[in-house]
Amino acid sequence: MRLLQATVLFFLLSNSLCHSEDGKDVQNDSIPTPAETSTTKASVTIPGIVSVTNPNKPADGTPPEGTTKSDVSQTSLVTTINSLTTPKHEVGTTTEGPLRNESSTMKITVPNTPTSNANSTLPGSQNKTENQSSIRTTEISVTTQLLDALPKITATSSASLTTAHTMSLLQDTEDRKIATTPSTTPSYSSIILPVVIALVVITLLVFTLVGLYRICWKRDPGTPENGNDQPQSDKESVKLLTVKTISHESGEHSAQGKTKN
């Protein structure tokens, strides 16, 4: 029994030693000598594409430190590159001066084939390659101004040109009508002023005529202005007449008396 126990212990010890040696060999195989690791960069010059860098990928295909073959076989390396659509580019060129505007829109479609190739080589794993293609559409709207033969013409939209032209034509026609046809409706000032002047002249004439009438038909200095007022010459003539009549009558009476006697 002791012999059997001793043999069993011997086999167990030998087995454990073998397993430990195998583990050391595996660990030695899994941990390589320090080799130079390089980084793989996938970059594209077209704008809008994201460049991806995989720093964990070694150059000689050996896994990084601290990993075993079984762990590496269970993990899979997947590199995905997202392609982004580029924005629209609007280019405007403008020059000053007497120019004519011309607008044109150009659409350019450029297919972008393989943006990146990511290759990973591992022991016991398959090679994986991903190719992505994106289509970039660049829309360029260009506004150019060309020199015009006439330096004073400003180029604008057709609608504004037509409206401005029609307005100028209407203005010209109205100006011509006003210049050719005289105004038939007189203003109030042209009526009122002559009337006022005529009234002033008439009043002046009336006053002058009345003054002349008074001067011409003025009474004579012999005629009494009032009933009681008489000039001295008239009084004297009346006295003389009365004296003559009285003397004549007295002479007749005396002659008659003489004849009776």
Swiss-Prot record:
Tissue distribution: Highly expressed in heart and kidney, followed by brain, spleen, thymus, liver and lung. Exclusively expressed in endothelial cells.
Stretches in topological domain Extracellular: 21-190
One MF term in the entry's GO annotations: carbohydrate binding
Chief site of localization: membrane
General function of this protein: Endothelial sialomucin, also called endomucin or mucin-like sialoglycoprotein, which interferes with the assembly of focal adhesion complexes and inhibits interaction between cells and the extracellular matrix.
PANTHER family associated with the record: ENDOMUCIN (PTHR15869:SF0), ENDOMUCIN-RELATED (PTHR15869)
Protein name: Endomucin
